[in-house]
Amino acid sequence: METTVNSKIANQVSASRQPRFSGMSHVSLPCRDLEESKIFYAHVMGGELIHEIRGFVEFRIEDIIIGLSEQPEGWTGPDDEYPHYAFYISGVNLELMKNWLDRYAVPNYPYRRGDTALIYFRDPSGNLFELYCDTGYEGIKALPLAPRRGGPPIDFRALNYRWDSKAAVQDIGKSILRPRFTAFAHASIFCRNLEQAKRFFTRVIGGELIHDVDGFAEVKVAGIIIGFTERPGQPTGQNAEYPHYAFFVEPEDFLPMVAWLRQNGVTTSEAWTRDGIKGLLYFRDPTGNLFEMYCPKLKDAQSFARGAKQGGSYTIDFAGLNYQWNG
């Protein structure tokens, strides 16, 4: 069956049209303790639990889905800035969120970059988040400058903590004014070679380069901003599934995108499915950051290999997805 699927994929690349992703489906993160994380993401982050199976949950937070699964490691390094995940937030809600984090003993660092107010904090596992407020925060002048704007260095290690969820549990069900995020802003990831990453994300992934300065670049892909830098950080572990970043792809673009990636020197998993309806595929960028393609309803998925956890025989070799890219 896989041979038939691969033969079909090989004939999918069009000379006139590059396949495209259609949006961001989800960001799935590793966690140390799933039950603790469920409390944090529901009560502190304001997420709505939308999916739960053994060992894995998903929360909807505004316009993004955050998945969580226990893993021995893989969260942002204790001294690192990358990867991190950012939400837009209004000025009023930024002040509320600062107080909210303090209320639940979550260390945080507010600062400013130009006219933008920001706050860094971590979840209990160590995944790093950023709040991004580019208008309406009245206290911005009192915030320290960003390090690259003349301010003090950020102590990312000090943002790590052992969380006591007792206060959050006690507040469940209470009528409290809660902060709200506006939308998902960006995912910023580590890369080993910035120039190579720019080529990969524009030429292969189809992103538009929208920011390129001081060792950091951003592309817009399917309406989502992805930043990358050589500053201290780490990609997805060689044998790990988390973190990974998933793009929606339309049915007509699924097989062409698989063929496009392979034609451009990207090692991919097999096209696979959990249920014969959804089409799935994993691949990495040249640094090793793990990405997923996700099509919710794909006719061709009937012929795809079924995952081992869903009663099939297909197991993803995550280490085998690492490769040397020559693009």
Regions found by a protein language model. Give the residues of each.
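Low-complexity, intrinsically disordered tandem-repeat tracts enriched in small residues
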Residues: 9, 37, 47, 57-61, ...
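Short N-terminal helix-initiation segments at or just after the protein's N-terminus
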Residues: 25-34, 68-69, 185-195, 228-232, ...
